[in-house]
Amino acid sequence: MKNVRKIFTAIIEYDPEKKQYVGMVPDVPGVHTVGSSLEEVRRNLKEVLELVLEEAGDEINLQEFVALEMIEVET
């Protein structure tokens, strides 16, 4: 079976209270992690994503649509 390269959207935020980065891949349930740097959280996300996809095989339910939007409000 030939491997297929897929690209997923990751959301990474910085948590100033815990002084760490928090990352998630909204298309794939269960893919979230933390890291002390952007490089570490990216590496961790890739590792978790690969593990979840390998474990689930064809049974995973990927989201069909994920969007990032900028919403403007007055405060």
From Swiss-Prot:
Signal peptide, first to last residue: none
Disulfide bonds, paired cysteine numbers: none
Stored Gene3D superfamilies: 3.30.160.250
Annotated Pfam families: UPF0150 (PF21748)
Domain of life according to the entry: Bacteria
Family annotation (InterPro entries): TA_system_antitoxin, TTHA0281-like, TTHA1013/TTHA0281-like
Any one GO BP annotation for this protein: regulation of DNA-templated transcription
Assigned protein family: Belongs to the UPF0150 family.
Name the record gives this protein: UPF0150 protein TM_1313
